């Protein structure tokens, strides 16, 4: 995580490598903004020759070149404004795209524990809202600082050029203005951090409402969800109003200081020693320049709020980039594992938990064996699977595949050896065929996909659909029943043809008839494969070569079905209970 005193300069230094590839566009836009501000300054400077000499009949040259100068300056102002807007939009668009890509890529390689600790809504807010804040804030800040800053410098220079005595008063007010901006900016940053954190909460509440809309309706939770959303949205409104109040207060301070300065200059210019040195054109240029300074000064005070939004968003994004990705230092690569698995003295505690989920686990599974993991919910069955897939890393002990430590395998190669059908299936908003062949669409033929679907008994319902395998199934397969979704997931695992098969309550959502069919298909593919089956139903467990009974993170019984029945222990009691049912 970033430190609280992470300076603006350090944030910019981290952001610059993302911006630097597009510095040519940035330079063009900066030059265009300076030209734009210079054009405004030169327009004001035309007042002096116009007032001093433009209305004298003897000076006809001014009436000739003055209109031409105005047209030229307006064309310069318009074209430079277009160029700056185009290139700033181009640069900011590229920057936000690259930040999103980098963030998405970084999140894709984060450990599972990262997602366990954060809501989907908060992470969505980082990718969408925060990245957009960086780009929009940066572009608006750049436009304001360069254009208005150049205008202020130009006006200062012009005022000092015409009368340094009157303009020297501005030297006094400049430090006061910047001190005021600095004080208010600290408050802006605190408020913006609260707003951005609560934007994630808004996304989280909306996400829960969309996903749990049926539960909300059936349990009558509409009012509770509305109240939660109203509270968070009102909090964001209150914080936004605090920014408006702070910004408006600063605006009042700047205007008050400017009015005092104008009054002082007006008084000084009326002194006999000064008024003799000034012409009507000079006084008009200085006063007009002073009034013209109000707009850029006001813009610079307002830009601070946008700047702080961008800085807070950058801090939030960089805090994610600073979290370490999955450890993947292994170099071992195999085409196809034999499937021999060994857990040696494994102890594991989930992040944020006090008690270990697994305690001193020792398991040896021969290649091609089917091992059933049974036990009550929370006993540690799924944790064993999570450690084998390296979704989590053991606190103590080692896990081996074919007598090689899992950490020595490249992660992608290790996971290519494992097909997983979890109780929490996720299907993508795509066709059935693309879901079955997920991430391997170019490798498998239509015939292979159909074969896997037939083996999983999924073709029974697929052929009844109008578009068959090309049917779009909706987000997470919402257009399918629970059993149909489960069979698609099983077909996906069958197609992978991996040496290790993990079935985590794979048939839990199926009716008896479908379960029998799928179980037959699973029995076929388990041959010559190492299979880990997590199940509660004895009918699924009985055929396993070995049964491991897990309770409170420990293996309390192991053996095949007949051996455990003869022991008359906990497994035998579970068996009798299910028979009675």
From Swiss-Prot:
Residue intervals of the ABC transmembrane type-1 domain: 27-309
Record EC number: 7.5.2.6
Membrane topology: Multi-pass membrane protein
Catalytic activity of the protein: ATP + H2O + lipid A-core oligosaccharideSide 1 = ADP + phosphate + lipid A-core oligosaccharideSide 2
Disulfide-bonded cysteines: none
Matches recorded under InterPro entries: AAA+_ATPase, ABC1_TM_dom, ABC1_TM_sf, ABC_transporter-like_ATP-bd, ABC_transporter-like_CS, ABC_transpr_lipidA, P-loop_NTPase, Type_1_exporter
Keywords noted in UniProt: ATP-binding, Cell membrane, Lipid transport, Membrane, Nucleotide-binding, Translocase, Transmembrane, Transmembrane helix, Transport
Main location (coarse class): membrane
Localization, UniProt: Cell membrane
Domain ABC transporter: 341-577
TM region positions: 15-35, 62-82, 152-172, 252-272, 274-294
Top-level taxon: Bacteria
GO cellular component, one term: plasma membrane
GO terms of molecular function: ABC-type oligopeptide transporter activity; ATP binding; ATP hydrolysis activity; ATPase-coupled lipid transmembrane transporter activity
Residues that hold ATP according to the record: 375-382
Entry-linked NCBIfam families: MsbA_lipidA, PRK11176.1
Entry text on domains: In MsbA the ATP-binding domain (NBD) and the transmembrane domain (TMD) are fused.
Annotated function: Involved in lipopolysaccharide (LPS) biosynthesis. Translocates lipid A-core from the inner to the outer leaflet of the inner membrane. Transmembrane domains (TMD) form a pore in the inner membrane and the ATP-binding domain (NBD) is responsible for energy generation.
SUBUNIT field: Homodimer.
Protein name: ATP-dependent lipid A-core flippase
